[in-house]
Amino acid sequence: AIAEALGLPFALPRDASRDADIVIHASGNPMGLQSALTLAAYEGTILEMSWYGSTLVPLPLGEEFHSKRLILKSSQVGGVSPARRARRSYADRMALALSLLADDRLDALITGESPFEELPELMVTLSTTPSGTPIGTLCHRIRY
């Protein structure tokens, strides 16, 4: 439903095409990154957007990684590479980001809203269900 609201095609990994020139992985799950290696085409690029912190991520770098000559590239949202920094000023990048956020389709990503004062109690609710399993919250907006 979210992909449709954003105007994007969606497929489960088992149903996805196995010849993508670019695979963007952002699940934060090592198994998802492993799946990304199988979805990329020959000489394809896997753009890893997940943050694992100090978690060790096992990744099969034999098999398809070498035979398909894949490129694994990381993304860091906290900084702009020196090679690209001169293209746009900080103000230009901020203006672009804010204009992109004005797209009403992004409202599909908001799965709830709460006041800031409720945040301490809300964090437990947002991170787990009563059974202790992760909850399906994508982006919970906090009102300040």
Kindly give the residue locations of the regions a language model identified.
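Adenosine-nucleotide cofactor-binding segment
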Residues: 1-35
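Conserved beta-strand termini and adjacent loop/short-helix elements that scaffold enzyme active sites
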Residues: 11-15, 75, 112, 143
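Glycine-rich phosphate-binding loop and adjacent beta-alpha segment
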Residues: 34-99, 144
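Short, surface-exposed connector motifs at secondary-structure boundaries
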Residues: 17-20, 41-47, 104-106
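C-terminal hydrophobic helical "lid"/dimerization subdomain
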Residues: 88-144
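Glycine- and other small-residue-rich loops at beta-strand/loop junctions that grip anionic moieties
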Residues: 21-25, 49-51, 86, 111-112
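Generic hydrophobic alpha-helical scaffold/packing signal
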Residues: 21-24, 37, 62, 98, ...
